[in-house]
Structure formats: structure tokens, C-alpha cells
Amino acid sequence: MNVSIPHSFTMTLKEINRSIIYSTTNSVISALLMYNLLTIISTTYLSVSFRRVMFGFNSPKHTNSKLILTD
């Protein structure tokens, strides 16, 4: 018995391979974009919270007295 693989089957295999490659590259790109977004958000949030800690909780009077004391 001679088993012949139909042409359509090989084409579907190629298409599946292509789609797998496309999906993996797509997922990698999306993951990188998400990582970039997260890093940007985290850095901005950290800088904002740091500024808030530095300037928000200390009232101007306290900062002025500190400056006078250091002088």
C-alpha cells in the first residue's frame, strides 16, 4: 500500500507553522510592549510618590526651619 500525502495537507502544515511563528512573534512583541508600559508606569509612579514623600508630607514651615538650621 502506497500512502500518498495530499498536497492540501502539506499546505495546511505550512500554514500552521506560519501561524504558530506569527502568534509567537506577536505574543513576544505584546509582552515587550506590556513590559515597557509597566516599567514606564512604575518609574513615573515611583518618582511621583518619592516627590510626594519629599515635599508633600513636609510642610513649607518645616523645610524652611530645616534650611535655617543647616545654615
Curated annotation (Swiss-Prot):
Q: Which Pfam families match?
A: DUF5438 (PF17506)
Q: What is this protein called?
A: Uncharacterized 8.1 kDa protein
